[in-house]
């Protein structure tokens, strides 16, 4: 069996899809379906069982036997960079992850988890080392601290433990994320409503490493199949502008022109203006995946979003 936490969420459900594509259906999805709309991410996927995230962690802490587990993909977390309830974030993202990690270590179950480029904060070098990290929000801190925890245990781990610092992920199955959905998702909705796609003032200078979720899932599968340990960046290695995203959305629809709106005050000083994954470590580990460009990935995403 394979366990995917956050399996009804954005990246988790795409990992489930990739596992299905490999013929694996013996999957336990762990999630919180209080937001019932997330069920739609699982409708076209095949899984063996579902468990609520609180019931699951209680079983983990109790040391319950789930049978033979080939891998755990731990994608579940509160991923809202705008959430400032630190007690909630640290319990949900940090403490939960530690419990699950030790369960896997004790049983030599390969453990793959979601870190984040938010651990870098406003740094301009994106290398998977402590000196380049400095999160700007409590979400980023929760991910940073777990990375630090993993770094301490990695030398003595007898089974794979692998974290991925996800950069700006976009693609299918993110619709439930609301304001945290990708720019491509929001621009598509604006055009569907008959509006022009809107970007913040200065967006031509904001460069991000936009990575397609299908590629993110593929990197996770690669790490599992190759028994990889370590903490790695997961991005394309190329920064592109928000303008490039808007142009790709406009190209799909064949209409619309970019409108500029004022930059929100509440995001100032907490906004990453530039991200670009350094893939040196990932490539050295043997990952040769060709990541989609914004033009390629957004075109595929728009075709999926607007399918009839």
UniProtKB/Swiss-Prot annotation:
Pathway: Nucleotide-sugar biosynthesis; ADP-L-glycero-beta-D-manno-heptose biosynthesis; ADP-L-glycero-beta-D-manno-heptose from D-glycero-beta-D-manno-heptose 7-phosphate: step 4/4. NADP(+) binds at residues 10-11, 31-32, 38, 53, 75-79, 92, 143, 169, 177. It is an enzyme of class 5 (isomerase). The keyword NADP applies. Substrate binds at residues 168, 179, 186, 200-203, 208, 271. It comes from the Bacteria. InterPro entries: Epimerase_deHydtase, Heptose_epim, NAD(P)-bd_dom_sf. Keywords: Carbohydrate metabolism, Isomerase, NADP. The keyword Isomerase applies. Its EC number is 5.1.3.20. The active site is at residues 139, 177. Binds 1 NADP(+) per subunit. CDD domains: ADP_GME_SDR_e. GO terms for molecular function: ADP-glyceromanno-heptose 6-epimerase activity; NADP binding. Its cofactor is NADP(+). GO terms for biological process: ADP-L-glycero-beta-D-manno-heptose biosynthetic process; carbohydrate metabolic process. Homopentamer. Contains a large N-terminal NADP-binding domain, and a smaller C-terminal substrate-binding domain. HAMAP family: Heptose_epimerase (MF_01601). Belongs to the NAD(P)-dependent epimerase/dehydratase family. HldD subfamily. Catalyzes the interconversion between ADP-D-glycero-beta-D-manno-heptose and ADP-L-glycero-beta-D-manno-heptose via an epimerization at carbon 6 of the heptose. NCBIfam families: heptose_epim (TIGR02197), PRK11150.1 (NF008360). This is ADP-L-glycero-D-manno-heptose-6-epimerase. The gene is hldD.
